Amino acid sequence: MFTELRSKLSPPRGRAGAVRAGFGERRDVDATAHFSFCRTLLEHTVSAESIPCHLPRTPGTSLTWHDSRSQRAASSRPIKLLQQPGTDTPQGRLYSDHYGLYHTSPSLGGLTRPVVLWSQQDVCKWLKKHCPHNYLVYVEAFSQHAITGRALLRLNAEKLQRMGLAQEAQRQEVLQQVLRLQVREEGRSLQLLSQASFGKMS
């Protein structure tokens, strides 16, 4: 009796083996499909990472940190100006102001340099412009004594007579033009001093 009941309740061995075999085959199919999916995903990731990516930088775009740092270092070099001890105005600024005054001031005439820096040729040009009547006489005397701009400002009647200008009219003509030149140079010096003092105050 018990043997018949057990045989009825328990499934046949052939059917159970078939069910177990079918379940095992389904697990194998799922594992194979999962492996193929992972492999495809891995190959896609590797192929995407192996593609070289070079973005061209178009003109006008923002620079990178390294580019901006190198340009900032190149453009931020300090420029030092010479400065005399005890003064607040750098020499570079003072000289540039004086240079601009000599060349751009409308009240100083056509001179581009101070008279003390004139050469013998500059003095001869000045004589030709301001003393045209006896120009050849003056040029010969001035050339023999190598009169420069500094010596021109120091001329007087006695020196002109020793230079060979025996006529009083000639000496007076030269001295009159020298006096005008001295007045103009003194005005220029005062203007330079006032400009320098104004620069220190500002």
Swiss-Prot record:
One GO cellular component, as annotated: cytoplasmic side of plasma membrane
Gene3D superfamilies: Transcription Factor, Ets-1
Domain SAM, residue spans: 118-184
Stored Pfam families: SAM_2 (PF07647)
SMART domains from the UniProt entry: SAM
Biological process, per Gene Ontology: cell surface receptor protein tyrosine kinase signaling pathway
InterPro entries xrefs: Aveugle-like_SAM_dom, SAM, SAM/pointed_sf, SAM_domain-containing_protein
Protein name as it appears in the record: Sterile alpha motif domain-containing protein 10
Organism of derivation: Homo sapiens
Gene: SAMD10
